[in-house]
Amino acid sequence: MVKGKRGMAIVIALIVLTCHLLFSAQTVHAEDSEGTQIAATLFVLKNASEVSNAKIHWAPVNGANEYELYRSENNEPFILLQTLTGTTMDDYDLTIGSTYRYQVKAYGGSSLITSAVSPEYAPHTLPDNLTTFDNTNQSTLNLPNELKVGDTYYRFNFVPKSSGGFGQMIQQTSTDDSTYGNDKVVLSYTDHPDLANSKFEGINVLYHAPTNKFVFWAHYENSTDYTLARVSVASATPGENFTFHKSFRPEGNESRDISIFKDDDDSAYLISTANNNSDTILYKLTSDWLDVENQVSVIYQDQHRELPKVIKKDGVYYLFSSQAAGWYPSIPMYSSASSIDGEWSELRTIGNTSTFSAQSGSVMRVKPNTGNQVIMVAYRWMFGWAGTENGTTEERLLPVTFSNGYAFYDYFDQVLYSANDDVVVPVQDGKLLSQGKPATAQTATGTNPANYANDGNYQTEWIGTGSSWPHWWKVDLGSVQEIHNVQISWWMQKGSEGFYKYKIETSTDNVNWTEALDRTNNTSYGFTSDTLSSPARYVRIQMESAKLHNNPSNWYTPRLWEVKVFGADEE
């Protein structure tokens, strides 16, 4: 844990959100690292009324240099859509009333290495009365409160002392999960010696039905530093005061970032980072959830992962985590297992290399417990959104898809959802025009050419030669298009993170250029999504400079992970 960022989030957010982290379950076996799986996310184009497009992802395969993507409609034979080097593709204008499956074949040279078939997907009309979560503006995710006992909903706020550290835990109640009141102090810093000079982070509150108790778990520290590395546990009968039981190190191990996972059989587990976040350890709780029964396994050793979150989907356990990087956007990864006390897969990449200018956060069902739609709520700390003056959201909502032990997510500016109806529909501002199109750059190394920045793979990159700035990268869309949105995944060095000052320039003839957007005021790390309106065949990213947070000199080499240009054919 670094500098209290989790605690800050907990103070300003209701405990209701953390309650969504406690997932119910449903047994499929995870694939090994030489296999692959494929899944799709259905999405709607901006201002359209049909959810008739699919963003398809598949896992990269060791030794593969080419993939063939196929589609089957209504269980007819698969037909080849495209041969490509990336690991994603969009498929547009699907038919309402039909069902679709996708197949990917991975080749090393002319040899087939492996293949996989996706689940079935059914395009549909856009439902009414969906709520919009805007990933580019201040947004609040509103999901049902799971802490309901009888006819009463409960939620908890945490108020610090004026001198800092934990002050009070305030209970609020509601009969409709809308209007909350009846504020009551249910835990105070005066209630136990361990609370006098303390702070909580990573707070989890669960309802344990067999004992009719709320159970509270949190990362526990003193109010001034991070030297204790303990967990803490408290409990209460709903409506009554909490009893603080103890703070301790589970099995004698450090404990920093934590979460609690509840399985189908009402067993519960503590997932905890230890040894300054270098290890991730899984513990089983006692049947009353008030103590650690035993250590189950060390899932990761020397991997430096933070904020571990587990969800069970279609019988498979998935563990999502963020790279330890302080306040800065970092690399998201996940592992999967067919049994929670069994062997976990290797860490796998997901999304882009900066969690789209955020950190891997809470993964949850939109409809608690019984829902099928899953989202990643990625956290944007201080340097993720660079202050609230630019109005960007403090969280990013990323729809997650799963297939036999593999997980995928991507970025959309807007996500529509309904918890009651278990609906998640991302919105894309135009078709992806740039993937696989001819790309050039001011310079490029022989092993990282310009087309690596628009190949449909977030894990490959274009790299320029030397460190001369400004520097440009350009794509030829093939014909004049109306440009709506440009998304850029920027390279960063862990420990010396920097953001880029840049301009987006457009041309219809590759001779006369227009400055379509000046982003030399950018302060977002790792990822940007820009809205613009410009007819163009050529789109050029003019990188003016990079500003490193810990060095006044820009020693970066110009490079880009991925550039995505969205829009529509100009008529």
PLM ranges: what are they?
Residues V2-K5, I12-L17, F408-D410, Q414-D455, ...:
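Juxtadomain low-complexity/linker regions and immediately adjacent membrane-anchoring helices
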Residues D32-G63, I96, S111-T125:
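Pro/Thr/Ser/Gly-rich low-complexity, intrinsically disordered linker/stalk tracts
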Residues G63-L80, T506:
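Extracellular low-complexity, O-glycosylation-prone stalks/linkers
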Residues H20-G35:
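Sec-dependent signal peptide cleavage junction
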Residues A59, D455-E515, N521-E571:
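Aromatic, loop-rich ligand-recognition surfaces of beta-strand-rich domains
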Residues D91-S111:
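Beta-strand-rich modules
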Residues I56-A59, I79, A116-G202, L206-R256, ...:
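Beta-rich carbohydrate-recognition and catalytic domains
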Residues L80-G86, L517-N521:
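Short beta-strand segments within Ig-like beta-sandwich modules, predominantly Fibronectin type-III
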